[in-house]
């Protein structure tokens, strides 16, 4: 199997793992909307697989998939196999690939530790605690406020990009008939819209933490879902967003099968 074949396979496993995680996030968030409780972020959802039948096998596959996905995204950022333009839009997209790669490195590590029983499955939203802890560390550094504001603004920018993707709903990165069938476009459209809203809320949390110099205001996916639950008509709002996140998971499974994967070996690998 060539390097390109391996990277394509790992990327597809990564899309499938992401799909599984988002479907579970949506399912648990819908349960919270109806019955109360605290929603889970992606690391919390991985913890629920520990006690599932063949859970450690699933976690091992997720770890492999997330690691492969991370390498693919980081390679995209370095080698630019899509031949993106060198303008601001192209640079922003490559930066997004790099950030996505880093995020999936942390998910691969979390899934790997759980698969090897090296960490506890307890705790519903470790991502929220880590957001608070690294925000506290950042605010203690010179220029930390400005950096945290920039990170929050980055989340807003990603939210806008995902919102635009939901609105246009072209999804021309999928193989097969173009444009994609209407039902696929609607799955992707609703999924990306829900994800855009979550990213915008996380961005606001980070900017608020920076401007108020209060790391407790920072939060991740779990806190964003709790914020929706606390709003007027929160049950309805969270239910809709939960369904949207589950649809994003379904769209990721579609991508695992049909997405065109652009791969280029970094020069330093020979």
Regions inferred by a protein language model and the residue ranges of each:
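Hydrophobic alpha-helical membrane-insertion segments
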Residues: 18-25, 98-112, 190-207
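Glycine/small-residue-rich hydrophobic helix-like segments
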Residues: 186-229
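Alpha-helical transmembrane segments of multi-pass membrane proteins
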Residues: 19-39
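Short, membrane-exposed interhelical loops at transmembrane-helix boundaries
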Residues: 43-50, 134-137, 215-236
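Hydrophobic, ordered structural segments
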Residues: 5-6, 10, 24, 28, ...
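Cytoplasmic juxtamembrane regions at transmembrane-helix boundaries
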Residues: 77-98, 165-189, 256-270
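A cross-kingdom marker for long, charged
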Residues: 235-255, 259-270
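Peri-membrane helix termini and adjoining interfacial loops of integral membrane proteins
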Residues: 34-44, 119-132, 171-175, 213-223
């Amino acid at each position: 199997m060539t390097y390109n074949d391996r990277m394509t396979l790992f990327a597809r496993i990564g899309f499938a793992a992401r799909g599984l995680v988002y479907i579970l996030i949506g399912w648990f968030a819908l349960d919270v909307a109806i019955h109360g409780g605290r929603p889970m972020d992606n690391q919390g959802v991985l913890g629920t697989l520990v006690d599932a039948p063949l859970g450690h096998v699933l976690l091992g596959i997720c770890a492999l998939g997330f690691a492969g996905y991370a390498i693919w995204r980081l390679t995209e950022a370095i080698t630019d196999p899509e031949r993106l333009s060198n303008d601001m839009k192209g640079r922003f997209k490559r930066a997004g690939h790099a950030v996505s790669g880093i995020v999936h490195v942390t998910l691969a590590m979390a899934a790997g530790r759980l698969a090897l029983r090296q960490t506890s499955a307890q705790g519903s939203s470790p991502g929220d605690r880590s957001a608070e802890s690294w925000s506290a560390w950042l605010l203690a550094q010179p220029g930390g406020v400005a950096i945290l504001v920039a990170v929050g603004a980055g989340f807003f920018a990603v939210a806008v990009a995902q919102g635009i993707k939901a609105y246009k709903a072209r999804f021309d990165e999928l193989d097969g008939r173009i444009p994609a069938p209407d039902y696929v476009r609607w799955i992707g459209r609703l999924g990306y819209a829900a994800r855009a809203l979550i990213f915008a809320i996380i961005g606001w949390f980070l900017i608020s933490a920076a401007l108020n110099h209060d790391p407790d205001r920072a939060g991740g996916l779990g806190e964003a879902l709790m914020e929706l639950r606390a709003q007027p008509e929160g049950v309805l709002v969270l239910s809709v967003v939960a369904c949207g996140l589950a649809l994003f998971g379904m769209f990721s499974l579609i991508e695992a099968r049909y997405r065109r994967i652009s791969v280029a070996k970094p020069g330093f690998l020979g």
